[in-house]
Regions:
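Acidic, metal/ion-coordinating pockets
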Residues: 1-215
C-alpha cells in the first residue's frame, strides 16, 4: 500500500476514501499508511472504540467524514463512504476494532453539516459500486434514494467503467479500476446565485496519448 499512498501524494490528491482492501494487511500497516498520507482520508460511516471520524486519535486523526474544497471560488464539499461489507470479508483481527456503520445515516449527517457550512455542491466518494439491484456491499440505490442534498456520487469497488448515469437525481460515475480510466466531473454554477446549473461526468482512457511520468515509472 505504500506505493499507492506515495502516488496519491505525488499527484496532489485533495483526499481519498478507505476501501475494504486497505485493511488486508492489518491495523498496524493501515496506521502506517494513514501516517504516510499527505491528504485527509474521508470515511464518514465507521466507528473505532466508540469514536467516529473527526474524533479519532493517533494516525486515525487524518480520517474525517468530509472536507470542503474551494474550486474556482465555489465551495465543494466532499464526503467519503466505505462499503458496509467489511465484516463479510475481513476477520476482526484485520479490522482492528473498526466497524462500518449505516452509510445512509452517516451521509445524511455529513450532508447536513456541509450544507450548514454553505457548500455550493456536495460530492460523495463511495467505495460502493452501482448494480441493477442493491446488495449487502453496494446499497447505492437506497442511499441516494433516502438522502437528499447530494449532487454527485463517485463510485468504486465494483471495478466497472461507467462514465455517467443518473440515480435519484444524483449524477454518478465510476472510472473503472487499476488506473485504466481517469474520471472527470464538470460542474457549472450561476455566478450570481451560486446555484449549480449543470453537471457532467466523463471517463478518459489512459492510453498512449498520455506520456508516462518518469518519476512514477521509476
Amino acid at each position: 500500500g505504500e506505493l499507492m499512498i506515495d502516488l496519491f501524494n505525488r499527484l496532489g490528491y485533495d483526499a481519498w476514501t478507505l476501501g475494504n482492501h486497505d485493511f488486508d494487511w492489518g491495523p498496524e500497516k493501515l496506521d502506517a499508511l494513514l501516517d504516510r498520507s499527505a491528504s485527509p482520508v474521508l470515511t464518514a460511516n465507521i466507528e473505532r472504540g466508540g469514536a467516529r471520524p473527526g474524533g479519532f486519535d493517533g494516525a486515525w486523526k487524518r480520517v474525517l467524514p468530509w472536507t470542503m474544497k474551494d474550486v474556482g471560488g465555489f465551495r465543494i464539499a466532499v464526503i467519503g463512504l466505505i462499503t458496509p461489507g467489511l465484516p463479510f470479508w475481513l476477520p476482526p483481527d484485520l479490522l482492528g476494532g473498526t466497524e462500518a456503520t449505516d452509510p445512509a445515516a452517516a451521509l445524511a449527517a455529513a450532508v447536513k453539516e456541509a450544507r450548514s457550512a454553505r457548500a455550493d455542491a456536495v460530492v460523495v466518494t463511495g467505495h460502493m459500486g452501482w448494480r441493477f439491484n442493491d446488495d449487502y456491499a453496494n446499497p447505492v440505490r437506497s442511499i441516494l434514494r433516502d438522502v437528499d442534498g447530494v449532487d454527485v456520487y463517485l463510485a468504486g469497488h465494483s471495478h466497472q467503467n461507467q462514465p455517467s448515469w443518473t440515480l435519484h437525481d444524483v449524477l454518478c460515475s465510476q472510472a473503472s479500476y487499476h488506473g485504466i480510466h481517469c474520471g472527470r466531473i464538470d460542474l457549472t454554477f450561476d455566478m450570481d446565485s451560486r446555484k449549480l446549473v449543470d453537471r457532467r461526468a466523463f471517463t478518459i482512457l489512459m492510453d498512449d496519448r498520455f506520456e508516462p511520468d518518469p518519476a512514477v515509472m521509476a
